[in-house]
Curated annotation (Swiss-Prot):
Name of the protein this chain belongs to: Integration host factor subunit beta
Signal sequence, renumbered to the chain: none
PROSITE patterns: HISTONE_LIKE
Keyword terms of this UniProt record: DNA recombination, DNA-binding, Transcription, Transcription regulation, Translation regulation
Organism: Pasteurella multocida (strain Pm70)
One Pfam family matching this protein: Bac_DNA_binding
Family annotation (SMART domains): BHL
Keyword Transcription regulation: yes
GO biological process, one term: DNA recombination
Role noted for this protein: This protein is one of the two subunits of integration host factor, a specific DNA-binding protein that functions in genetic recombination as well as in transcriptional and translational control.
Amino acid sequence: MTKSELIERLVQKCHAVAAKDVENAVKEILDQMSFALESGKRIEVRGFGSFSLHYRQPRLGRNPKTGEQVKLDAKSVPHFKAGKELRERVDIYA
């Protein structure tokens, strides 16, 4: 599902709210989540999951085109861990 598809679905469910207001709300939520992660904070949405940053050590990589070794710097990457409720909802083998 894309951001625009999410906005469309929310507009269909919430007839009392203008489409532009829904779009602005979704954008603001995503902006606030991004700002929190930039600040090194953890985001927890109970029943859904949590977002945090994971540190990646510097390492040697390889250029796939030339095969040449390339030094990759350390970096932080976003990480999502699904909550128990979400894991149970998507578990088709349960």
